[in-house]
């Protein structure tokens, strides 16, 4: 995929989009019964591990606070239309390609800025999931005048991008990973120590272990790491490690070994499964576990938050069951249920996505596909990353990448600045704050078209958050 320089290249973008849209304020309401149901579900699912059951089909609607929200984002006039790059990954099974639709959150930020007369030009490029491709993407964006770059992919191949960015003094924000964080590279992922603590607390909680134990130790809780070798999991004292593969023959051997380990009752406790791997591998492994009747709690990797994972899981009879959890940060649609400032800011994002989805003339970042095809998956990290660069470029005195990099390092942004789901503090290389913990689904993801074809659109679930307050960071 090449660039689409026409996106945002017309400084009158906001005028065209505003003319297509009505001027009335969008009001989002959630009925009392929905809020009550989600609260009950949150309490129930958040405190116990149960025999997994398929969750009820979602309605396809997005919950939001019952408040008036401001969709437009206005920044101080600079007299320039800044150029910001977004790197994503296209290609079947290419490393990081699972996050391509999530990256459309950056398109939402661009749209909101245009509504507020603060247009930005977005250059969008495919890194092909290779280290060389990532390097070439950054080099191309730099040559085209990008003042900052959002890395909306995930995986070791991003080292090519971060190396090239550092050579050119161009700031980058990794929306979904933490490769080479530091020295002009900011990350919205959990930092390694924070991730380790949250995993440990989550495992102990799922196992029903006492909260008075050490938050750094599993204290005898049985854990089995299902390692596909394609992802990463924190370095914890797992009871067992099992190499897994999506290959059918290998999966049979994996299930046989796992059944043997699960049958060992000597410790008197049921094990917690930790799954790592690509989106496609995790989906296929979970589907195989379900077919084999294995119902142990599973902590899946963050790839479970992507469309390819959900689509592959649902194919051929798989289900998003209530024993599946993900360690992560609060999600936009769940945050929108809150009545505080963060909830209102997240509601603005959710309502803008819905507004854009209903405008058939709007395209995604590529300029080729209708935004409606990816609307359901557009997320907070990519939105917040583009927004942060917009703020930085609005405050520089010199319109250079070096100046943007310096200013970005001084920024602290929160809901009042329209960040979604969590605040940002760029004095740290790990800039995302807010609450982290165990994400659990409250509604089953479903095929919008009702089929099982790989071309069908998929509706995501709403992932709620069970927090561990000691691990939250503001």
Q: Language-model segments: what does each one mean?
A:
Residues 171, 178-202, 243, 316-332:
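Short beta-strand elements at the ligand-binding edges of bilobed clamshell
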Residues 362-386, 390-452, 470-473:
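Segments of small-molecule ligand-sensing domains
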Residues 185-296:
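Extracellular/periplasmic Venus flytrap/periplasmic-binding protein
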Residues 39-64:
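C-terminal region of N-terminal signal peptides and the immediate post-cleavage residues
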Residues 1-26:
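Terminal targeting segments of Actinobacterial cell-envelope proteins
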Residues 66-105, 113, 131, 374-376:
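Extracytoplasmic "Venus flytrap"
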Residues 97-101, 116-181, 188-190:
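Beta-alpha junction/loop-to-helix N-cap segments that form part of ligand/metal-binding clefts
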